[in-house]
A protein has these predicted regions:
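Bacterial N-terminal signal peptides that target proteins for export
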Residues: 2-12
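Bacterial N-terminal signal peptides
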Residues: 11-21
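Sec/Tat signal peptide C-region and signal peptidase I cleavage site
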Residues: 22-26
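Charged, low-complexity C-terminal accessory regions
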Residues: 27-29, 36-38, 150-192
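Short, charged N-terminal beta->alpha structural module
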Residues: 30-56
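A short, well-structured beta->alpha microelement
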Residues: 54-74
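A short, gly/pro- and small-residue-rich
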Residues: 91-115, 163-172
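Structural recognition of alpha->loop->beta junctions
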Residues: 129-162
Length: 192
């Protein structure tokens, strides 16, 4: 009898852990489609976000070198900007971190003018928090975001959760990149 009760309790706890494998800090903020996804640092995170948007049925366009003018010409409601850099990616794109920061500052300024929701996403883990370029990418995007999504190992120092608390930005913490579908579904109010 005791074994059955213990098994039942353990099973319930296991299900709850699975259901809540990501946590949210801050007030709930929702966003609308269509979505444009870009990167501040030319890492492959934008491609991952774009693909995971598709998995939950979200209408997104990936534009690695997104400029403010493109926002003026299109009717996007949300911009998702991935944080973290790739030296190879920036080299292939013919850019550097200073140019990336200037480009993204322009995108953020235009997005705010249009009343778009800005989502900052650091979903590639601590490997994208190793140098000054990564730091510049993060500090360009995170404080200006309306919502932050961060992978747990990217937040070991609690930078993102502390920033969210300080600025009133909701922060969604996920354990693994593939779990990005959970906060995306919640933020865009879609059922998977």
């Amino acid at each position: 009898m005791k074994n059955m009760k213990l098994k039942s309790i353990l099973m319930t706890m296991f299900v709850l852990v699975l259901l809540f494998s990501f946590s949210v800090q801050g007030a709930e903020v929702t966003a609308e489609q269509p979505i444009v996804v870009t990167t501040c640092g030319q890492s492959p995170g934008a491609l991952m976000v774009h693909q995971l948007c598709g998995q939950v049925g979200l209408n997104s366009e990936k534009k690695d070198l997104l400029e403010a003018d493109y926002l003026k010409e299109n009717d996007f409601k949300t911009v998702i900007i991935t944080m973290g850099t790739s030296g190879k990616g920036m080299g292939a794109a013919g850019t550097d971190m200073q140019e990336e920061a200037e480009r993204i500052n322009g995108v953020i300024e235009e997005a705010k003018k249009q009343g778009m929701t800005i989502i900052g996403a650091h979903i590639e883990g601590e490997a994208r928090r190793v140098d000054k370029n990564d730091e510049k990418s993060i500090k360009t995007v995170a404080p200006e975001s309306d919502i932050i999504i961060v992978r747990k190992d990217s937040n070991k120092d609690n930078y993102f959760t502390d920033l969210g608390e300080e600025k009133g930005i909701p922060v969604h913490v996920i354990d693994k990149t593939l779990q990005l579908t959970e906060p995306l579904s919640e933020i865009f109010q879609v059922s998977k």
